[in-house]
C-alpha cells in the first residue's frame, strides 16, 4: 500500500474516531481523579454533585455521580486541588489540598452525612502514595523532588534514576554527552521516548531525547519503564512525560546561582591500565544561574510564566596516564599529548508559557522552550590527544499549543499542535590522518567529524475522554509531519591507520613503526587502513508518523479496574525507502542477481516501513480488601519502537549523485594497498601512501556496500508485569513488581559477503566471498563487504523491583528501591545499534548469547529529604550497583572473516580456527567478564531563611560523589595478551559528563517567592 493510500486511511480513521460517541481518550500530560460517594451506611449516592477547583488558577469543573455513586475527572492539569461533594438531602464534604500528579489517577471517596450540615475532610497537600487503578510500571517525580534533591547537571532526567530498574548508561552518541542516559531493560538508552506537555521530544536521528528544559520550568514528570497504556507509543523502552510550570493568581518565582571550582574538587583516581592509579585534579570552574517568574496578567483568566538558565563552564578532562605515556612516544608522528584536555561549555535554556481560561469548560495554553549551547572537545574520553578535538554547536526548540474543552460533564476533548526543531553541528578545525591503537588510544582527526543533524517536526494530536457508567473510554490520534530530517555525516574523513600493537610495543621492535604488518587485523577501533570519500549528506523529506489508540478503563467493580487498550503505529519513510532503488549497493545486487541466488533474494523486494504495528495492551488492578491498602496488579502489552535514521544513513548516502562510501577498508594480510601493489602484510609506515580515489557516482572496488534488509521490520517488545502494593499507612507504601521484557527484531548488521572457507574441513585451501564471483560476472565493482541492516537481534530482561516510599513521616520523604535483574541477549553492546555478530554466518550462535553490556544484577537506589531543626534540610541520593560485564577480545580477529564483523573475535581456550569451522569448539562466551561495582552518593545540605510568609532564601552546599569512590564500572580492557588485560582503562561511562569522577563540591543559593 503506497503512502497516499495510507494517508487516506489515516484521515478516515481519524474521522471515525472523532465522530464516535462511545470511544474517547486522554492526553499523556494530564492527571485524573475518581471516587465514590456513599452515605454513612455505605449505600452509594447517585446524582451527587462533585466540584473540583484548581487552587492556583481558580479553574473549576463539575460533574455528577452515576448510578453506582462513581465520579471521574479526566484531562486535569497536575497541581493542588480542593474537591467538594454534595447530594440531595446530604451535607457538603470537602477535601482540601489534594495533589494530582501527571499520568496518575487519584482516588478521593466521600461519605456524606444526612441533612444540611457541612463538614470538611482534611487531606494532606501531597500526592496520594497509592494509585488504586494503576496497572503499569511507572514512577512520578514530584515538584518537591525536583526542587530539593541534588542535580549534578540540572537535567531533570537525572531523577529518573529514582524509578526502580533504571540505571545510568554511557552516552551512545556525540550529541548526547551531557544528557542523563537511562538504561531500561538492559538497553543503551536509545529506546526512551520523551514528551513535553504531550509533544514529541524524540531524536529520530540517533534515538533518545533531544531537548533539556530549564529545571526551574519543570513542574513534574512521570517515567513509565514498562507496560504503559495505549495512550503512549513510539517506544519499546520507557516513556517519560514532562509538564512545564504555569502562572497562577499569585505571583511566584525564583532566582538561583550555583558555583563550582577546582578547589572544591578532590583528586581523581586515574586508572593506569595496570591495576594502579595516578591522581589528577583537572582545571574546573562552573557558574550556573537563572530564575523564573509567574503570575496573573488577568486574574482567573490569563496567566504567564517564564524561566531562564545560563551555564558557563571552563572545565577539562584528565588524560589516562597510560594513554598519555603511549601518546608521548609518537609526537614525531603528529600526536599532541596533554595531561588535560579542555572541555569548555556555554549554554542558555529558557521557557515561556501563557495560559488562558475562556470559561469553566474551555482553556488553552502555549508553551515555548529553547536551548542553545556550544562546546569544545566534548567527545574526548581520556584516551585522545589535542589533535582529536572537536567543537559542537546546538540549537533546539520545542513548543505546543493545547486547547482543553469540557463538552459535557462526561465528555472531554484535548487538541494539541506541537513543533520541534533541532540543529546540531560537530566539526574540527583541522584534518590530519587518524592513528588508533589497542585499548582505544588515538590521535588525529576524529572519525566522527564533521557531522550535522537537523530535525523539524509538526505534530497534531487530538485526545478525547468519555465516561459512560463504569467505563471511561479513551481514544486519540497523533500525527507527526517531519518535512526535513537529516544533514551530513562524514565518518572516517581522513586516512585511518589502525595498529594492532601499542606504541610502546611497536617501538620495542627492531624496526619500530617501519615493521611490516602492523595494520593486519587492525584493532578494536578499526579495520587496519581505511578512508571514506564522497557526498556525506542524508536527507529525508516529508517523513510521517501516525498513531491511533483506543482504551477502556473499566471499573468492573468497586475493587477491580481493568484496562483494555489497542494502539496502532505506522511510520512513513523512516527506513529510507525512497532511496533504496537509487542506492548503489541495491543496484549492484540487482546486476548480480542473475548470477547469485543470494543477491537475487536481497533485491526480490525492497524494505518498507512496517505496516502491522498493532499493539494490544491489557492490565488489571484489584483491591484485595476494599480499603485501598492492598492492591495487586498485572498486565501484558506489545510496544513498537521507531527506526532511527542512523540505521539507514549509510544506505541513504549511497543514493546521492556522488555517493559517500568507504573507498577502501583493508584488514587481511593479502589485502592490497590501493595504488601501491603492496599487500597489507608488507606495508609499513614510510611505504608509499595509498591512492585515494576521487568521489565517484558508483561504488569502487573494495568499498563497503550498505543495504536495508528486504525483510526489515520495526523493533517490538512483549512486556508482562505483576505487582503488589501495600499501603502501610497514609504516609508509607511498599511495592513489589516483577517485569519480563522480550525484545524482538532489534537492529543487527550482518556482512553477507564475509570471507567463507572454500572447504570448512580444510581451511588451508583458502577463503572466498559469496558475492564476489557474481559481481565479476555482472561486470560491476567487487565490493569489500555487503553490510545488511537486519532486524534479527533479540534480548530479554527479567527484573524484580522492591520499593519503599514514605512522605512526611517524621519530617522525612524517602524513596528506597532494590532491583534484582538479568539482561541477556545476542551480543548486546552498549550502543544498542549496528551490532555486528562475531561470525556473520552464525548471528545467533549459542556462545553469542549472554549478558548485555548494561546487565547489572543488583541495584540499590535511595533518595530522601529530611527537614531538620533550625531550617536545615538534608537531601541525599545514593546509587549502588553490582559489576557490569565486559568482553574478552583478541588483539586481532582470530577468524579470517575480513571486515564487517565484530572486532577481536576470540576463540575459546584450546580452540583453533580449524576446530571452529569443524564445529569441534567455538568462540569465547560473550561478555563473560565483570568489571567493578558502582557506588555514588550525592547530597545537598540547605539552610532555609524565611523572609516572610511566602519568601524563602535557601543557602546550600552540594556534594557529588561524596565518598570519592572511583567508579570504573565495566570500562576494563578485555584484550587478551595485553598488560592492561583485566584492569580498568578509565571511568564508567567515559564519554558522559553526568557522572562525577571524584568528589565535586558546589555552593549555591536560591530565592523563592
Could you describe each region identified by the protein language model?
Residues 156, 169, 436, 579-615, ...:
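Solvent-exposed loop/turn elements at secondary-structure boundaries
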Residues 967-1009:
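C-terminal beta-signal and terminal closure region of outer-membrane beta-barrel proteins
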Residues 252, 282-325, 329-374, 391-419, ...:
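Transmembrane beta-barrel wall of Gram-negative outer-membrane proteins
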Residues 66, 90-246, 265, 271-278, ...:
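Periplasmic N-terminal accessory/gating domains of Gram-negative outer-membrane beta-barrel systems
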Residues 731, 735-881:
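Gram-negative outer-membrane beta-barrel transporters
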Residues 689-697, 871-950, 954, 989, ...:
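Extracytoplasmic gating/loop element in the C-terminal half of outer-membrane beta-barrel translocons
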Residues 2-142, 200, 214-216:
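Periplasm-facing N-terminal accessory domains of Gram-negative outer-membrane beta-barrel systems
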Amino acid at each position: 500500500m503506497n503512502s497516499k493510500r495510507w494517508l487516506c486511511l489515516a484521515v478516515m480513521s481519524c474521522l471515525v474516531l472523532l465522530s464516535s460517541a462511545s470511544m474517547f481518550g486522554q492526553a499523556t500530560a494530564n492527571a485524573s481523579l475518581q471516587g465514590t460517594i456513599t452515605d454513612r451506611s455505605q449505600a452509594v449516592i447517585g446524582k451527587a454533585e462533585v466540584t473540583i477547583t484548581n487552587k492556583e488558577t481558580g479553574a473549576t469543573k463539575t460533574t455528577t455521580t452515576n448510578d453506582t455513586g462513581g465520579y471521574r475527572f479526566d484531562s486535569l492539569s497536575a497541581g493542588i486541588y480542593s474537591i467538594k461533594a454534595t447530594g440531595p438531602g446530604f451535607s457538603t464534604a470537602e477535601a482540601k489540598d489534594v495533589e494530582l500528579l501527571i499520568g496518575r489517577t487519584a482516588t478521593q471517596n466521600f461519605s456524606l452525612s444526612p441533612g444540611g450540615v457541612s463538614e470538611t475532610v482534611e487531606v494532606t497537600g501531597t500526592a496520594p502514595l497509592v494509585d488504586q487503578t494503576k496497572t503499569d510500571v511507572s514512577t512520578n517525580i514530584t515538584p518537591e523532588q525536583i526542587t530539593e534533591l541534588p542535580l549534578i547537571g540540572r537535567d531533570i532526567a537525572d531523577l529518573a534514576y529514582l524509578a526502580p530498574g533504571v540505571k545510568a548508561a554511557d552516552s551512545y552518541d556525540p550529541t548526547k554527552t551531557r544528557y542523563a542516559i537511562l538504561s531500561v531493560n538492559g538497553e543503551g538508552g536509545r529506546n526512551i521516548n520523551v514528551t513535553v506537555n504531550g509533544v514529541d521530544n524524540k531524536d529520530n536521528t540517533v534515538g533518545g531525547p533531544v531537548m533539556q528544559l530549564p529545571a526551574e520550568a519543570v513542574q513534574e514528570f512521570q517515567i513509565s519503564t514498562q507496560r504503559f497504556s495505549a495512550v503512549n507509543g513510539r517506544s519499546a523502552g520507557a516513556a517519560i512525560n514532562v509538564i512545564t510550570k504555569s502562572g497562577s493568581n499569585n505571583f511566584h518565582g525564583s532566582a538561583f546561582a550555583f558555583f563550582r571550582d577546582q578547589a572544591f574538587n578532590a583528586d581523581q583516581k586515574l586508572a593506569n591500565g595496570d591495576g594502579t592509579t595516578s591522581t589528577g585534579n583537572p582545571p574546573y570552574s562552573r557558574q550556573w544561574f537563572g530564575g523564573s517568574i509567574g503570575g496573573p496578567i488577568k486574574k482567573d483568566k490569563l496567566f504567564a510564566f517564564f524561566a531562564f538558565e545560563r551555564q558557563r563552564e571552563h572545565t577539562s578532562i584528565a588524560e589516562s596516564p597510560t594513554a598519555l605515556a603511549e601518546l608521548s612516544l609518537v609526537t614525531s608522528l603528529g600526536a599532541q599529548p596533554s595531561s588535560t584536555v579542555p572541555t569548555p561549555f556555554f549554554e542558555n535554556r529558557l521557557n515561556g508559557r501563557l495560559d488562558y481560561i475562556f470559561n469553566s469548560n474551555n482553556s488553552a495554553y502555549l508553551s515555548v522552550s529553547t536551548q542553545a549551547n556550544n562546546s569544545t572537545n566534548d567527545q574526548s574520553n581520556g584516551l585522545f590527544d589535542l589533535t582529536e578535538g572537536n567543537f559542537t554547536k546546538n540549537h533546539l526548540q520545542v513548543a505546543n499549543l493545547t486547547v482543553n474543552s469540557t463538552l459535557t460533564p462526561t465528555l472531554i476533548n484535548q487538541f494539541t499542535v506541537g513543533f520541534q526543531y533541532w540543529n546540531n553541528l560537530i566539526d574540527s578545525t583541522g584534518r590530519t590522518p587518524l592513528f588508533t591503537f589497542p585499548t582505544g588510544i588515538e590521535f588525529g582527526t576524529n572519525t566522527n567529524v564533521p557531522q550535522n543533524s537537523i530535525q523539524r517536526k509538526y505534530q497534531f494530536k487530538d485526545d478525547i475522554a468519555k465516561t459512560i457508567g463504569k467505563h471511561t473510554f479513551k481514544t486519540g490520534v497523533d500525527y507527526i509531519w517531519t518535512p526535513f530530517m537529516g544533514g551530513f555525516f562524514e565518518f572516517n574523513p581522513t586516512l585511518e591507520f589502525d595498529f594492532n600493537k601499542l606504541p610502546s610495543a611497536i617501538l620495542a621492535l627492531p624496526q619500530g613503526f617501519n615493521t611490516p604488518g602492523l595494520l593486519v587485523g587492525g584493532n578494536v577501533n578499526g579495520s587496519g587502513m581505511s578512508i571514506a570519500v564522497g557526498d556525506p549528506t542524508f536527507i529525508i523529506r516529508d517523513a510521517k508518523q501516525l498513531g491511533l489508540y483506543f482504551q477502556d478503563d473499566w471499573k468492573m467493580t468497586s475493587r477491580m479496574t481493568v484496562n483494555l487498550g489497542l494502539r496502532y503505529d505506522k511510520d512513513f519513510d523512516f527506513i529510507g525507502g525512497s532511496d533504496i532503488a537509487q542506492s548503489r549497493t541495491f543496484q549492484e545486487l540487482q546486476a548480480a542477481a542473475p548470477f547469485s541466488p543470494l543477491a537475487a533474494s536481497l533485491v526480490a523486494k525492497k524494505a518498507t516501513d512496517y505496516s502491522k504495528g498493532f499493539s494490544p495492551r491489557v492490565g488489571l488492578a484489584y483491591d484485595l480488601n476494599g480499603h485501598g491498602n492492598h492492591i495487586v496488579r498485572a498486565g501484558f502489552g506489545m510496544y513498537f519502537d521507531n527506526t532511527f535514521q542512523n540505521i539507514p544513513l549509510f544506505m541513504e548516502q549511497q543514493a546521492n549523485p556522488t555517493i559517500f562510501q568507504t573507498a577502501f577498508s583493508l584488514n587481511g594480510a593479502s589485502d592490497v594497498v590501493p595504488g601501491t601493489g603492496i599487500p597489507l602484510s608488507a606495508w609499513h609506515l614510510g611505504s608509499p601512501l595509498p591512492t585515494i580515489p576521487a568521489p565517484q557516482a558508483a561504488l569502487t572496488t573494495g568499498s563497503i556496500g550498505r543495504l536495508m534488509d528486504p525483510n526489515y521490520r520495526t523493533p517490538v517488545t512483549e512486556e508482562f508485569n505483576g505487582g503488589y502494593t501495600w499501603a502501610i499507612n497514609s504516609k508509607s507504601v511498599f511495592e513489589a513488581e516483577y517485569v519480563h521484557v522480550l525484545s524482538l527484531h532489534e537492529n543487527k548488521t550482518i556482512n553477507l559477503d564475509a570471507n567463507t572457507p572454500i572447504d570448512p574441513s580444510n581451511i588451508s585451501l583458502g577463503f572466498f566471498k559469496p558475492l564476489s564471483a557474481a559481481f565479476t560476472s555482472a561486470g560491476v565493482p567487487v565490493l569489500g563487504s555487503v553490510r545488511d541492516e537486519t532486524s534479527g537481534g533479540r534480548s530479554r530482561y527479567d527484573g524484580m523491583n522492591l520499593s519503599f516510599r514514605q512522605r512526611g513521616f517524621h519530617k522525612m520523604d524517602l524513596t528506597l528501591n532494590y532491583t534484582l535483574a538479568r539482561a541477556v541477549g545476542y551480543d548486546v553492546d552498549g550502543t544498542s545499534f549496528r551490532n555486528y555478530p562475531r561470525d556473520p554466518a552464525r548471528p545467533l550462535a549459542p556462545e553469542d548469547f549472554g549478558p548485555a553490556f548494561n546487565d547489572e544484577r543488583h541495584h540499590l537506589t535511595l533518595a530522601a529529604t529530611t527537614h531538620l531543626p533550625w531550617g536545615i534540610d538534608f537531601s541525599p541520593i545514593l546509587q549502588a550497583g553490582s559489576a557490569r560485564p565486559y568482553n574478552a577480545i583478541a588483539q586481532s580477529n582470530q577468524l579470517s572473516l575480513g571486515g564487517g564483523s565484530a572486532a577481536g573475535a576470540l576463540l575459546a581456550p584450546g580452540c583453533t580456527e580449524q576446530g571452529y569451522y569443524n564445529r569441534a569448539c567455538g568462540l569465547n562466551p560473550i561478555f563473560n567478564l565483570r568489571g567493578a561495582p558502582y557506588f555514588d552518593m550525592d547530597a545537598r545540605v540547605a539552610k532555609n531563611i524565611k523572609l516572610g510568609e511566602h519568601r524563602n532564601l535557601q543557602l546550600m552546599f552540594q556534594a557529588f560523589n561524596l565518598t570519592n569512590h572511583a567508579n570504573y564500572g565495566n570500562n576494563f580492557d578485555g584484550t587478551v595478551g595485553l598488560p592492561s588485560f583485566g584492569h580498568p582503562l578509565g571511568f564508567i561511562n567515559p564519554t558522559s559528563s553526568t557522572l562525577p569522577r571524584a568528589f565535586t563540591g558546589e555552593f549555591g543559593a536560591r530565592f523563592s517567592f
